[in-house]
Every structure is written in C-alpha cells, then in structure tokens.
Amino acid sequence: MSAVVEFRDASYRIGARDILKSLSLRIEPGETLVLLGRSGSGKTTALKMVNGLLFPSSGELLVDGRPTTAWDPVRLKRGIGYVIQDVGLFPHYTVAQNVGLVPRLEGWDEPRIRERVDSLLAQVGLDPAQFAARYPRQLSGGQRQRVGVARALAADPTVLLFDEPFGAVDPVTRLDLQKQFLALRRDFGKTSIFVTHDVREALLLASRIGLLHDGSLELVATPREFQQSTAPEARAFLACLEWQPERQ
C-alpha cells in the first residue's frame, strides 16, 4: 500500500541555515503521525511542505504518490484539511458558512452542504441548531477549535494537518478536545499529521511519533516504543512527565 504522504530525503533551508535536514518519512493510510519536538525543531516547516506552502530545497515530498511540485496548488490545498492554533475562521462568516466554505468552492449543491455542515457540527459536539448561525466572536476558544476541525473535514480531504491546534486553550478544554480528536479519528479514519511540543499529547494521540531535533528526525516510534527509548532527546521529553517540584 502506498503512503499518503512521503518525505524523500527532503530538506528545507533558508540561506545557509538548514531548517529540515534530509527528512525521510512515510505516513501510512489512516494513521496519526505526531511530529514532536522543541520550538524551532522544524515541525511546522514540515507541515507547511505537505500542503505546498513551502517546497523542499532538495529531495521531494509526495502526496498521494505525486510530488507536491507537480500538483496544481489549488487542488493540493483543497485536498488537505488544515487546523492551526489560532483557528483562522473568517470573522464575517457564520459558523455554517465557515464550515461549508471549501465544499461550496468545490461546487457542492446547497442541500448537500447544509447536510454536511450539520453532520460535522454534531460530530464535533456543537448542536447545529444553536451554533450554525453564530459568528466566531460569539464562540469560546474551545468552540472555535471545534469549528476549525469541522471545517477541515468538510470536503472529505485526503489528509488532515494539525499545527498545535489545542495549545491556546485551558487544560480542561484541551483534554476534552483531545478526546474529541480520538473519537473523530475512530469515526473517520483519516490520515493525520499532528504537530506538538507536548509529550503527553503526543503519547495520547499518536499512532506513531516522529521526534524532530534541530531539523533532523531522531526517532520514529509507537507511543509504547517511545516510552522505552534510550535516545537522549526522547529521554529529555519523557523526563518532563516525571519531574516534580521540591516540597518545602
């Protein structure tokens, strides 16, 4: 079975600085690959390369078996759902209009769009009767993130990209959103690439974890394998789970 996304010795550099170094990685159908790393490790750069916001300086990146440089840019982006930390909802559009935007651009008829919007809102835990006509300013941070996830799923994309989507909400809401993500993964079976610097989140959500350090892929492992790894960078992240402040 061919990979949905494949990095083939892909590097990205700005001037003399290597942001990503010879990344080779396959993301298989239906899996959630979590890219874990410190700030500046290249996680978001890798994500932007998948949907054609950036292109490899060397090597190549394939989506559905085709190099991103060979895709029509619009078709590539519309085939990928993207969820980011600040959501990026259009403030002058209602929730329903935001979620239905890409299906409308794809030429879906209005009854089909309404059905899809209502179904997705319900699946992310928002009652369509209460939320479809609201504007983003009328939503909490957690509710906006749920709308962002629904929008990403709306046109049935090949792959979903999540760039630290839950980092700006409180811990209780964050756990609720993580549980919702796991439920959606079970229901939709979508291939996902999820970026985080939170090792707890990586262990909870990942099928496999790709550990990036200073632009290099240090380790690819299941959550269980990651917890047993002796790799120094993996141990540094796992130590965050164990540390407790000294009690006076």
Please name every model-derived segment:
Residues 51:
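Helix-to-loop junction immediately C-terminal to a conserved catalytic motif
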Residues 160-163:
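Catalytic Walker B motif of ABC-type/P-loop ATPase nucleotide-binding domains
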